[in-house]
Amino acid sequence: MKIDVIISADYIDSEALKGKIAVVIDMLRATSVITTALYNGAKKVIPVVSVEEAFEKAKELKSLGEEVLLGGERKALKIDGFDFSNSPLEYKREIVEGKNVIMSTTNGTRALNLCSKADKVIVASVLNGQAVAKYLENEEKEIVFVNSGTNGEFSSDDFMCAGYIISELCKNKEVELTDIAKTAKYVYESSEGIEEFIKDAKHYNILKNLGLEEDLKYCSTKNLIDLVFEFKNGEIKTVESGIKVKI
């Protein structure tokens, strides 16, 4: 198994992902939100690129009698007319269970849609990192960890999350790492902890300055969730893999 890392959404070559497994990360905060919403019983999450597309999709689903919630952000702030911002702590079970969540964010939902030509697209965060690693042990195709980044730029939080999952995967699977994948693994294994390492990251401090310290702490917590989620046909749902992940 070969493992590679893409450092931001701007570097995604959709055609080059054909035949590969893409593992999309937007640790702060889209993939943490998706992981949390589905764990708390959301029927599915539909990631879209634009705000206009989100409203159109919501209208379409509501016309079919579906319950819909809108979540997302622009410049880390809630979008006018949406039900939620991009804080995972808002997606509580009593609110999202059984409902469709349509999301649009600056970085994460864009990255997910750019990866749609991959053979499989897995949604990953620190929250379910060990579960993702365990799931990937059963794959033989090349795996590409796709860091969403921040506005097209490298983001150390996503890189750290990729390094963490790669490190977990290497414990039980013989893999071939590209230089950048080796670097991500090394950075994670040499650190004093995920949140401690990313405290100097630009995006981390944008969120901190908005008073979102609880989000940052939550998104940096390992293995709260033992489920794996796949983006397929425009929707994200829990993987029905039959694999029991013990955490």
Curated annotation (Swiss-Prot):
Q: Which family does it belong to?
A: Belongs to the ComB family.
Q: Which InterPro entries match?
A: ComB-like, ComB-like_sf
Per the record's keyword annotation, is Magnesium included, yes or no? yes
Supply the enzyme class, top level.
Answer: hydrolase
Report the EC code(s) recorded for this entry. 3.1.3.71
The species is Clostridium perfringens (strain SM101 / Type A)
Q: What is this protein called?
A: Probable 2-phosphosulfolactate phosphatase
> Which cofactor is recorded for it?
Mg(2+)
Keywords annotated in UniProt? Hydrolase, Magnesium
Reactions catalysed, semicolon-separated, are: (2R)-O-phospho-3-sulfolactate + H2O = (2R)-3-sulfolactate + phosphate
Question: What are the recorded GO MF terms, alphabetically?
Answer: 2-phosphosulfolactate phosphatase activity; magnesium ion binding; sulfopyruvate decarboxylase activity
